[in-house]
Amino acid sequence: ASPAYIREAGEPDTPQSLVNFRCINRCFPSGEKYRWEFISPSGEPSEVSVRGDLVVDSDTAMIQAAESGLGIAFVYQSLVTQQLSAGSLVRLLPDYHYPADHFCVYYPSRKHIPVPLRAFITWVMAQNKSILSE
């Protein structure tokens, strides 16, 4: 969220309290809105259906909307490093994190994995570790 939005609305103290704030929603191609996912400091997962009239379909649009003070965004921290450093965005709920390890790479068979596919899988795993370490 932008500092201006935080001054106006305050800060949430838990993911569940996000329902009391104007959030920027993300829409899947199906039209369904994304439920924000969190892991608590104690390791408990939770999901929140946030409120807000603005619905976007890209990280770029979500970041721009948040910088403009239109609400709270939910994006990977690595995508907003510059904005956080510059002070145009403020990180909220620092004790909670996104369960980024919950994704899969599907491929036909483990018996004969082509070298390019093996390289891709290795790269995806490395990217995931990088995101989780932030």
Q: How would you label these PLM feature ranges?
A:
Residues Q16, I63-Q64, R118:
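Alpha-helical segments flanking ligand/cofactor-binding loops in enzyme cores
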Residues P3-Y5, F28, P41-S42, S109-K111:
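Short loop segments at secondary-structure junctions
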Residues T14-Q16, C27-F28, P45-S46, T81, ...:
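Short secondary-structure boundary/capping segments
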Residues E47-R91, Y98, I113:
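Hydrophobic hinge/microswitch elements
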Residues Q77-Q82, A86, Y96-E134:
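C-terminal effector-binding regulatory domain of bacterial HTH transcription factors
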Residues R22-S42:
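Secondary-structure junction motif
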Residues A1-R26:
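Flexible hinge/capping segments at coil-to-helix
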